[in-house]
Amino acid sequence: MYKRQAIPGHNLPLGALGVFILWFCWFGFNCGSTTAATYNLGDIAMTTNLAAAAATLVTLIVTWVRYGKPDISMTMNGALAGLVAITASCDVVNDYEALFIGAVAGVVVVFAVEFFDKVVKIDDPVGAISVHGVCGALGTLFTGIFGEGCSFITQMIGFVAAVSYTHLRAHETRHDLV
């Protein structure tokens, strides 16, 4: 047996550039998803930016406290976690709720990455499960809690349906490969 050892990213500036490009393009994604240029495009852009900024700052602080130094790579994942978490509710929450959603995503992504790496032992070098799966689910559920005109029960049904469908398809695929 060999000892597992992470291979650290070799070019943080290039990784940061990628995150900033994604952050910039997320405005088009969230604003464009409304399918109509209405009065609330500015609000959508603002909630998108606030959630990402809050997640970035909170992830930086959490990693600094937890590891004794800021983890820039994890902080970049925090920015993406905030963007993913706000996507479902960007048009139905206010600025303070967007800050809260981003801040929670910033904390959750750190512990989710550790959980999948150390407990579940899944090789996820970029933290995609934590960023997109966990923080996406979190954002979906927060839409039901904070979203104007949204129901938590409806969001929970959608979440359970998506997880169930994914589990069934993955189980079928696994048997097809054997």
Which residue ranges define each predicted feature?
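Helix-coil boundary and interhelical linker segments in multi-pass alpha-helical membrane proteins
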Residues: 34-40, 87-96
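Conserved small/polar residues in nucleotide/adenosyl-binding loops
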Residues: 1-5, 166-173
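Cytoplasmic-side transmembrane-helix entry/capping segments in multi-pass membrane proteins
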Residues: 9-13, 70-79, 127
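Transmembrane alpha-helical segments of multi-pass membrane transport proteins and ion-pumping complexes
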Residues: 19, 23-27, 31, 51-64, ...
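Structural signature of hydrophobic alpha-helical transmembrane segments
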Residues: 42-52, 96-103
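Interfacial loop-to-helix junctions that mark the boundaries of transmembrane helices
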Residues: 6-11, 37-47
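Membrane-interface helix termini and inter-helical loops of multi-pass transporters
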Residues: 31-39, 150-154
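Membrane-interfacial helix termini and the short, flexible loops that connect transmembrane helices
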Residues: 3-9, 69, 114, 118
